[in-house]
């Protein structure tokens, strides 16, 4: 029974990976690029990006995102495991927003050269509406960090914070994310301070977000605006 059980578990995991993976770009062996691209540290590597709608891209195609465009520029294998509405700490399966990331990371592929986690927006919203503090988020974020380090000991791992959303619990959530990641020596791109994404301004959102009332999801122009910041950050890892 043991071999059968192992095979059954492997099959379930494979099906779960297929169900959760939003897009898989493979390396193009005939890719043409200038030498400065081909010689870059990102070129031809495998990128796994994991998170919420900042990764799945809400109602727009994944191909419009900064991370997909980055992968295409450097001919990377690209594996997208975004899930709209997903949280680091809170299970939202009943709402069709998926299990919490501190558990869901286990379905990620075994190999990656770069692992990017974009998360925290929905946790902050939940804490804002329920009035609870950050202790539970902190505890489960630690589980996620430890799990990813163990799963990907040779990968370049980093987190990206949400934007500087002007609502309660977003600053508190971001402070915890920065603190916890620092305690594990995980690099973080602090998008609340360094992104150039002015989420508090309606005119800015009308140009660069998927709708003027949206405070999370960039449109294609917004992703193009943010891409150079993340490109510089990732090339420096």
Predicted regions: what they are:
Residues 46-48, 54-134, 139, 168:
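Conserved SGNH/GDSL esterase-like catalytic core that processes O-acyl groups on lipids
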Residues 121-122, 145-179:
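Active-site segments of SGNH/GDSL-like serine hydrolases
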Residues 20-34, 121-144:
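N-terminal-biased segments
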Residues 77-79, 156, 185-187:
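Conserved beta-strand segments of alpha/beta enzyme cores
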Residues 94, 164-237:
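Catalytic His-Asp segment of secreted/periplasmic serine-dependent ester chemistry enzymes
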Residues 81-83, 160, 191-194:
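Conserved beta-strand termini and adjacent loop/short-helix elements that scaffold enzyme active sites
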Residues 1-50, 54-62, 71-73, 108-111, ...:
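N-terminal secretory targeting modules
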Residues 64, 68, 72, 139-146, ...:
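Solvent-exposed, polar/charged alpha-helical surfaces in well-ordered, non-transmembrane soluble domains
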């Amino acid at each position: 029974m043991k071999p059968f059980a192992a095979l059954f578990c492997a099959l379930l995991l494979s099906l779960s990976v297929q169900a959760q993976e939003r897009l898989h770009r493979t390396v193009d062996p005939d890719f043409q690029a200038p030498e400065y691209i081909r010689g870059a540290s990102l070129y031809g590597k495998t990128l796994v990006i994991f998170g919420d709608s900042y990764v799945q891209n809400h109602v727009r195609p994944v191909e419009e995102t900064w991370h997909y465009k980055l992968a295409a520029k450097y001919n990377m294998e690209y594996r997208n495991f975004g899930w709209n509405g997903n949280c680091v700490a809170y299970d939202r399966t009943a709402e069709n927003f998926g299990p919490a990331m501190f558990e869901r990371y286990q379905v990620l592929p075994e190999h990656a050269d770069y692992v990017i986690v974009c998360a925290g927006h929905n946790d902050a919203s939940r804490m804002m509406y329920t009035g609870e503090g950050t202790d539970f988020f902190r505890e489960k974020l630690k589980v996620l960090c430890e799990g990813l380090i163990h799963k990907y000991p040779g990968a370049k791992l980093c987190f990206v914070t949400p934007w500087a959303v002007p609502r309660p619990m977003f600053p508190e959530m971001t402070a915890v994310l920065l603190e916890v990641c620092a305690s594990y020596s995980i690099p973080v791109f602090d998008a609340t301070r360094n992104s150039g994404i002015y989420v508090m301004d309606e005119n800015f959102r009308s140009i660069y977000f998927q709708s003027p009332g949206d405070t999370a999801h960039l449109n294609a122009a917004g992703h193009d605006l943010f891409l150079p910041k993340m490109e510089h950050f990732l090339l420096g890892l």
